[in-house]
Amino acid sequence: MKRLLSIFLAAICVIVLIAGQIHWKGKTAIPNKQEKAKEGKISETRDIAEEQRFEALLSFAANWPEEASTAFAQKLRKEEPYKIVFAGSEALGEGADSWPEIVAEKMARTYGDVFDFAFLSYDLTSTEFVEQNKVQDLIKEEADLILLEPFTLNDNGRVVIETSLENIERIIDAVLDAKQDTVFLLQPPQPIYNASWYLFQLENLQRFAEQSGIPYLNHWEAWPDTKDPAINQYLTNDRSAPNEEGHKLWAEFLIDYFIAN
């Protein structure tokens, strides 16, 4: 009889333990499901926000060449910086009031921390740039996009336009040989008052860009006409470079290109 009672009590204990475990699992299962559902919603919300940010950043790049915006999108997905180089003559200026700095600062504020910038300026003609192998500076940057002001004003009276254009081709070809997906944009230097032969040079530069399929950012559209003395208000006294107001004018044009409204 005692043996039967012991077996009975043991069975009761086992049943109680099993019932308690089932009850505990039932209590914890609901919070766990709720927690997982909450985490899923948070993750989904985060994904939606990231996608909206991605689309917004791409919309700012709407003016860019297709190959540039595509590469930019890929860099965004990989969370890698997109490298932009502004290169050319001393018309690039230096310091916070120069057009490269103004453009870069505005792009950083608009897009966020998604770019690496480099500014390369030279007091050289295009021929000197090529002969001194300064193109290696561009190659070392491994840029995704290069905005080149190709020394056209420095070449004025020193290098014939045919040679200038050949030099531009050599520069671009050398960079593309090293990194074939680099995208080039061309732009003129600053305008000058009462220009004559300089206008002929730039007509040829623009034609070269169009025939080569290279976007030509003609910021002269933002300046007074070259026959208007008012243009001197935007240039240094010797007309060799834009002054502070000229840099602002130049920068505003480029900002409108790099940051689509």
Question: For the regions a protein language model found, what residue spans apply to each?
Answer:
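N-terminal secretory targeting modules
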Residues: 1-83, 259-261
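Conserved SGNH/GDSL esterase-like catalytic core that processes O-acyl groups on lipids
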Residues: 75-160
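Conserved beta-strand segments of alpha/beta enzyme cores
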Residues: 116-118, 183, 213-215
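Active-site segments of SGNH/GDSL-like serine hydrolases
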Residues: 149-150, 173-204
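Charged helix-capping and loop-helix junction motifs
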Residues: 161-171, 199-206
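Catalytic His-Asp segment of secreted/periplasmic serine-dependent ester chemistry enzymes
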Residues: 195-261
